[in-house]
């Protein structure tokens, strides 16, 4: 047997809050896509720099890169 709604009182309506009203302009550009590549090159460059940073940290942790004048001891 299927469920049947008798009246519309069970439907929830969203209430408007001050925070929602103040944040609404930030979401006004939702769904709009700028033509072209946009900031993809900047994002790729940033990801490459982050990968270099992570590899340097990994090499220091594995002691494959020794820094002069800085004692590296994990004891």
Swiss-Prot record:
**GO annotation, biological process:** photosynthesis; protein stabilization
Q: Which residues are annotated as modified residue Phosphothreonine in the UniProt record? A: 3, 5
Q: Name one GO cellular component term.
A: chloroplast thylakoid membrane
Q: Transmembrane ranges?
A: 41-61
- Which GO molecular function annotation, any one, does this entry have? phosphate ion binding
Q: Which InterPro entries match?
A: PSII_PsbH, PSII_PsbH_sf
Topology versus the membrane: Single-pass membrane protein
Instruction: State the compartments where it is located.
Output: Plastid, Chloroplast thylakoid membrane
Q: What does the UniProt PTM comment say about this protein?
A: Phosphorylation is a light-dependent reaction catalyzed by a membrane-bound kinase; phosphorylation occurs on Thr residue(s) in the N-terminus of the protein.
Q: Is Phosphoprotein included in the keywords of this UniProt record?
A: yes
- Alphabetical list of PANTHER family matching this protein: PHOTOSYSTEM II REACTION CENTER PROTEIN H
State the NCBIfam families in the record.
PRK02624.1
What this chain does, per the record? One of the components of the core complex of photosystem II (PSII), required for its stability and/or assembly. PSII is a light-driven water:plastoquinone oxidoreductase that uses light energy to abstract electrons from H(2)O, generating O(2) and a proton gradient subsequently used for ATP formation. It consists of a core antenna complex that captures photons, and an electron transfer chain that converts photonic excitation into a charge separation.
Q: Could you give the subunit structure recorded for this chain?
A: PSII is composed of 1 copy each of membrane proteins PsbA, PsbB, PsbC, PsbD, PsbE, PsbF, PsbH, PsbI, PsbJ, PsbK, PsbL, PsbM, PsbT, PsbX, PsbY, PsbZ, Psb30/Ycf12, at least 3 peripheral proteins of the oxygen-evolving complex and a large number of cofactors. It forms dimeric complexes.
Identify the HAMAP family for this entry. Answer: PSII_PsbH
Provide the family line.
Belongs to the PsbH family.
Q: What is this protein called?
A: Photosystem II reaction center protein H
Source species, please?
Pinus koraiensis (Korean pine)
What gene does this protein come from? psbH
